[in-house]
Amino acid sequence: MSHKAWQNAHAMYENDACAKALGIDIISMDEGFAVVTMTVTAQMLNGHQSCHGGQLFSLADTAFAYACNSQGLAAVASACTIDFLRPGFAGDTFTATAQVRHQGKQTGVYDIEIVNQQQKTVALFRGKSHRI
């Protein structure tokens, strides 16, 4: 694990009101890699009483943000897609793992997998980053 990646993540987390509000915690960091978790609360449920897709997107996007900023070079999302594969419910704990697939001078591609507490895949997210 990279000490620099952890420092960068903690510096970002200090200002990340969204991640804090969603109860997202950083579990692991390295260059181009991040693992974050979130427990689904009743406030995160949609009208079908399953986890709202926007909450899943936010979890994946947070892992993506920490991974693509792990080297200390500021980056933002330029495009993202997500595939929802199975529902989640109140009390479920989701883990999002982000891994770099390509990092050029300006643009990067990252894949994020969200799994539940049974290690079953809940969603797959791909993010494209741009360094600013």
Q: How does the language model describe each region?
A:
Residues 55-62, 80-86, 113-114, 127-130:
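Hydrophobic alpha-helical segments of small multi-pass membrane proteins
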Residues 14, 19, 39-63:
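Hot-dog-fold acyl-thioester-processing enzymes
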Residues 1-4, 88-90, 95, 101-132:
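HotDog/MaoC-like acyl-thioester-processing domains
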Residues 1-37, 41:
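Non-catalytic linker/capping segments at the edges of enzyme domains
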Residues 49, 72-73, 119:
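Detector for glycine-centered tight turns/loop "hinges" at secondary-structure junctions
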Residues 20-22, 32-34, 76-80, 92-94, ...:
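A generic structural signal for short beta-strands and their flanking turns/coil linkers
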Residues 65-95, 100:
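Hydrophobic beta-strand-centered segment that forms part of the acyl-chain substrate-binding groove
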